[in-house]
Amino acid sequence: MYTQRMFDMWSSVTSKLEAHANNLGQSNVQSPAGQNNSSGSIKAQIEIIPCKVCGDKSSGVHYGVITCEGCKGFFRRSQSSVVNYQCPRNKQCVVDRVNRNRCQYCRLQKCLKLGMSRDAVKFGRMSKKQREKVEDEVRFHRAQMRAQSDAAPDSSVYDTQTPSSSDQLHHNNYNSYSGGYSNNEVGYGSPYGYSASVTPQQTMQYDISADYVDSTTYEPRSTIIDPEFISHADGDINDVLIKTLAEAHANTNTKLEAVHDMFRKQPDVSRILYYKNLGQEELWLDCAEKLTQMIQNIIEFAKLIPGFMRLSQDDQILLLKTGSFELAIVRMSRLLDLSQNAVLYGDVMLPQEAFYTSDSEEMRLVSRIFQTAKSIAELKLTETELALYQSLVLLWPERNGVRGNTEIQRLFNLSMNAIRQELETNHAPLKGDVTVLDTLLNNIPNFRDISILHMESLSKFKLQHPNVVFPALYKELFSIDSQQDLT
């Protein structure tokens, strides 16, 4: 089934983030001697963060991970005696509040993947930076609760009640901020931010189709951004959201300094000629592999957006399927050297014409991609603003097929409020009363059009080259079968 395959890939893509969860401390949270917190001991209220294993109400940091009493006791028992748990299914059982006792094997594996260990350090002995990240997460959850209480007391994706089993995903090892403990940085080897630690299985090969319009067609309608909700999203929640997304962006992209170093290098004429002389089939495959690498990091970024992992599984998949290509264009804008009209492609600067083929539709696709990426680059956004813009684009609530419209709208409102605050602080209006935000929002229809062009060109290419095998993730994201699963 497509859904299972997709989340298998996500699990492998984010394994390195999960491995860093053991930065949290063991046992109950206690403030170091002499340390006082004016907000009422944030550490003592760490239970506001749901259990990382099953999503139930947590009771503190146990064996290095924020968990509930049930998962704490389960892990203790699993370590105190010789156990030989067996999974009666396929070792991919859902581990949530309702189902956590159904498979001890999968529950233990999830504990271990999150970093639970008998040797984990206590919270008070964590580094100052690690403690601050935990405190930031607590502040974020508290700010979300305040915004929820003021704006929509009836329901919210930030409800502190334990989500129902239907809302808990089997990849719930990432709650809305779980990536915040990661000190991981994506490797410098690729200007696309592709880490060398990604396994070969993640770049398996795959298939494609044309029925993409149904799930990406954009019809301009006025998105209602609840002014009352935004007015209550105070500086606390804005500041933490901005910090969170900026860190997620930094950890899933190559450093901007490294990109600019490549801009300053002399053009590699031999490499440019090599790409210009590639045949249509070779160029498609090479571009698909580069795009797949970028999308793997986009998936990591999405999972670190506060609240994203609490959306339904179907909505998460749909948002990523219809939004990943759009976010790739946004990310391309920071790799574009406007003075050369060239993009950092792997480890070489390539001009726009290097991607042209003899097919007129493909040339149009390349031109539209460069044109849109250039329009973003010309705005000279900061890295933080790019992070917020990616969140805004991904969470655009008017995508066909989404079910949790209210939840997605609330997440979108938070991102909208944060990016508006950031842009108004850093940018003057462009012309008259036209703001940078206006320009960014006007790009949304362009993203939809380019996504459709991509699928049309890809469909035509597959008809002409039926034996070409694309990377697995690329095939899953842009195949007709997987699109039909979501409609």
Swiss-Prot record:
**Which GO cellular component does the record give, naming just one?**
nucleus
One MF annotation (Gene Ontology) recorded for this entry? RNA polymerase II cis-regulatory region sequence-specific DNA binding
GO biological process terms on file: compound eye photoreceptor fate commitment; metamorphosis; negative regulation of transcription by RNA polymerase II; positive regulation of transcription by RNA polymerase II; regulation of development, heterochronic; regulation of transcription by RNA polymerase II
Q: What induces it?
A: The expression of this protein is developmentally regulated showing peaks at midembryogenesis. HR3 transcription is ecdysone-induced.
CDD domains recorded for this chain? NR_DBD_ROR
Ranges annotated as NR C4-type zinc finger? 51-71, 87-111
Q: Known InterPro entries for this protein?
A: NHR-like_dom_sf, NR_DBD_ROR, Nucl_hrmn_rcpt_lig-bd, Nuclear_hrmn_rcpt, ThyrH_rcpt, Znf_hrmn_rcpt, Znf_NHR/GATA
Gene3D superfamilies given for it? Erythroid Transcription Factor GATA-1, subunit A (3.30.50.10), Retinoid X Receptor (1.10.565.10)
Q: Which residues bind DNA?
A: 48-123
Where can this protein be found? Nucleus
Alphabetically list the UniProt keywords. Answer: DNA-binding, Metal-binding, Nucleus, Receptor, Transcription, Transcription regulation, Zinc, Zinc-finger
Instruction: Report the main location listed first in the record.
Output: nucleus
What are the NR LBD domain coordinates in residue numbering? 237-480
List, as start-end ranges, the regions of compositional bias called Polar residues: 157-167
Region spans: Disordered: 145-176
Q: What does this protein do?
A: Putative receptor whose ligand is not yet known.
Q: What protein family does this chain belong to?
A: Belongs to the nuclear hormone receptor family. NR1 subfamily.
The identity of this protein, by name, is Probable nuclear hormone receptor HR3
Q: Which organism is it from?
A: Drosophila melanogaster (Fruit fly)
Gene coding for it: Hr3
